Structure formats: structure tokens, C-alpha cells
Amino acid sequence: MPPYAAELARIEVLLQKLCTESTNRQLGQLAWEHIATGGKRLRARLAVQTVCAHGARADLGIAWGAACELLHNASLIHDDIEDGDRFRRGKPALWARYGTAQAINAGDLCIALSYAAIASVPVSDAVRWQLTSVMTQASRRIVEGQAAELDLLSSGVPSWRDYADCVEGKTAALFGLPIEGAALIAGRSCAEAMALAHRCRQLGLLFQIQDDILDLFGSNGRDMPGSDLAQSGKASAFVVEHLRLHVGDVDWLMRILTAPRKETSRQQIDEVIQRFADGGALAAVWQRMDEIRCELVESQEISREPALAALVQEFVAAALRPVEHTRPRAIADGLGSNG
């Protein structure tokens, strides 16, 4: 049996229970239908494993892991609506099957249920209040990050800092969240938990870049390769790095990025992907990933705690493994010679 399989199974049971026992059973079933499509349950794993890394029992992280997964899935439901993605995890997105209005409601329900899950965390009222505060702050960051992403191209060519700031709010907040809450559950101070969460948000940046790579050079369960690229007004790590390297391509790429999705052809997307690969953006993105990895695993907050360091290394490997085949040979050779 895989590590923490029992705890993850209990999280799954709790997720289904919270959704299906909703006052509006039809809406609860919609929320559960989305959650049950799968996913890697990374936030649940982070919650349970971080509790253990701090020396506490794994079962103390079950309800917190469910709370984090509910907020994460709420963000996915809303994200699919805003991006117009008709597929999620290889299946029809909730809005594409049941309409935008009910999908919004299902996402909102997941947010509300995340707080219901916190009520089940077996800690003192004081710690439970801290968890509620942490959840609220993460929710705010996610919404602000999503709004910033939608406006990323409206003020000109985005920098890497602009891109990272968006990810910091949208994706990274959902990686810092389970770690911060788990640290609180295990008895760490608010300051210690916050410092760990701030550092571990870099995991979210790695996983977002992974998603950017899979969108172009792999499969991320959406309706077509380049789905994010075709989405009007959406910038990725590749857009940022390509425009840094090829300023003369600004007008060409911006026309494609800001065109309505239905007006973006398969040929245009293929051309963009080819230019990203040939023009150095792929190599530049990989260099960024390696820099983030080194900064994270070598940081004082992580390296001084062996159990936590091992956990972070495990999740860094999980971020890199699905896209390792896209790593340019020159970068791979360089890592080998340094290893």
C-alpha cells in the first residue's frame, strides 16, 4: 500500500460526505462530480505529510487536507469558466456540461465547504481559528492572482516578475496553504508556519511552469495542445521568456494571444510552439525551473529540517518528472557534469 494511502482514502470519504450532505443535494452532487474526476490530490498529500514531517500523527491532517482540496477544486471550476476550457482532467468541465451559472454555484459551494472541513480538524479552538484565518488569506490571494493573470497582457509585455507575482497568488497560494496549516496543527507558531508557507509557495511556481510546459509539449487533460496559449489574454512562462529573448516578436505574438479563441488556428498555435522551442524560450524556462528548485531545497527554512527537506525534495521531483523529457540536452548535460 502506498504511503499515507489510508489517510488519503479518509480524505476522499470526507470530501464526498461534505459535498453530498449539502442542503442542496443536486448542487452538492455537481461539486462531488467535479472532485471525483480525479487529480493528484497534491494539497491533501502535502497537508498529511507535512503534519508528519513536524512529528505529529498523520490523521491530524485529514480534515485540513480535505479543506485544502475543496478550495483548490473551487478554483479549478471557476478557472475553467473564465478560460473557456471545456475539458478538465480529460472529461467535460462542469460549466460545459451543466452551464456557467450552476458551475459558479458549485465552485462557491466548495469554498464554503472548505470552512466546514476546518470545523472537523481535531485541534483547539484557538488553532482552528488560525486555520480559518489562513484559509481566508489564501482565498483572497487566489482571487487576486486570477484577476492579475487575466490582466497580465493589458499593460504591455510582462516581465518574469509580473508572471511570478500572478502565480504567487493563483497557484502558489494553494501550495503554501496546506503546509502553513499543517505546521499550525503540529504546534508550530504562526510566525514559523508563515515562513515555511512563504518559502514553499515556490513549489506552486514549479507546478505552474510544469502546467505551462504540458500545455505545449505534453498533455494536461484539456481540450487541445496549446489550450492555454489559445486563451485570449493569457500569458505563460513561455510567452514571458520568448518576448524577453525576441523583442521583435511582440506584435506577432500579442496578436495571437489577444485574438478571440475561435479565431486562433491550429497552424498558428503550432507555429508559436515551434518558435518557443527553436528560439530559446524552452531552454530559458528550464533554467528558471532549475534556479527555483535550487533556491527552494537549499533554503535555510527547509534544509535545517531533514524530514521537511525530504518532503520538499519529493514534491520537487513530482513537479519535474512529467516534463523531464522536454529538458533541452545542453541543460541536462550541464546538470550531469555538475552532479
Which residues does each PLM region occupy?
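Mg2+-dependent prenyl diphosphate-binding active-site environment of isoprenoid biosynthetic enzymes
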Residues: 3, 9, 13, 17-252, ...
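Charge-rich, solvent-exposed alpha-helical interaction surfaces
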Residues: 14, 271-275, 311, 334
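A short structural micro-motif
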Residues: 52, 138-141, 202-203, 259-263, ...
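Short, charged, amphipathic alpha-helical segments
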Residues: 194-197, 287, 309-314
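Hydrophobic alpha-helix feature that most strongly marks membrane-spanning transmembrane helices
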Residues: 208, 218, 243-247, 258-262, ...
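A structural signal for short secondary-structure junctions
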Residues: 231, 291-294, 303-306
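Mobile late-domain/C-terminal helix-loop "cap" segments
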Residues: 251-300
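Short, amphipathic C-terminal "tail helix"
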Residues: 303-339
